[in-house]
Amino acid sequence: MADLNVVTLISIGSHPASGRPRRAEQDARAVELGLQLAGEKLNVVHAGDPQEETLRAYLGMGLPGLTVLEQSREADALPALAEHLQLAKAQLVLTGTQAETGEGSGMLPYLLAERLGWPLIVGLAEVESIDGNTAQVLQALPRGQRRRLRVRLPFVASVDSAAPAARQSAFGPARRGTLELSLIHI
């Protein structure tokens, strides 16, 4: 699976008690799953402010860097993300289930899959194997049940809370990691 082009989309979260910016919990699970699949070759993308210090919490998970598609807080992330994913030739796109800040409708994975014309897996718990252009995955269902699915590449998947928990963010790697600014013209 090392040759697989995995992209994880991240956002800025909000602490439930204090409201302070933090690493979004579901997005961090998506990064963890991406790291298990692609290691340091994982591409992590954020659409928003490149000066957001909270992005370093994701770098602290062991990422050498991440890409920021610069845009205002009010801008729709969908067009920029779709164009970036097509240019990057992504094969597997991992997202959280719902943003913790902003609109937080949970529609991004659905709209992104529709725009790209790719299948969508909701509630991804694990990617078991990838054989050629097909992946075998486990989808989380209510009451701890799982469903094994086969899906063609490329596809979009929203990661469930049943996926592996995200590792802690370490200060050193968070400071050493790089933020690459990418300009997408829509």
Could you describe each region identified by the protein language model?
Residues 89-101:
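Short beta-strand-loop elements within alpha/beta enzyme cores
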Residues 101-120:
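Short Gly/Thr/Asp-enriched flexible loops that form oxyanion-binding sites at enzyme active sites
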